[in-house]
């Protein structure tokens, strides 16, 4: 599936005759995993596509691509695995408002 239509696996969109979005709803399966189904998939299909731009109070920008996020997501997953956290375990994360945690 190509990038322009991949998101349709997870959303319903309805547009009017002028191309203006009229309705939008989210759909996802019970086994939906944002890191795998979105970040890793986009990281695989278009690794250089911009996913996130962080701007600090001084106006400095930090850009992250889907490829960057996929690598960071895998690092986090491996860290959790190393701590003995398994699929299905419940965890709570308290994160600062910083791009490294988004």
What are these regions (language model features)?
Residues 23-30, 59-64:
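Acyl-group handling in specialized metabolite and lipid biosynthesis
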